[in-house]
Amino acid sequence: MFRILRIHGESMAPEYQSGDFVFLMKVFRKGLKQGDVIAFENRLYGTLIKRIEKNTDEGIYVVGTGENSLDSRRLGPVNRDKVQGKVIWHIRRR
């Protein structure tokens, strides 16, 4: 299953910028590894896109590349059930 999302915000800049599009592919939990960029659902902030820092028994730790990224340093680990997919393709806005 595939999904297209539009990036809002600068938490993953400069790699992903506001207005860019990403294509997600649903993956099995074991298919996620360090360095992958994933989209996941957060109950307070909606869908977020971040890079996997580490995948542990307690959850997935994610980081953003932007200066003030809202990531696991503030939110804690991501529950694997909240992962919507892995970014497989990126289209930059012009």
How would you name each of these model-derived features?
Residues 1-94:
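Extended hydrophobic leader/signal-anchor segments used for secretion and membrane insertion
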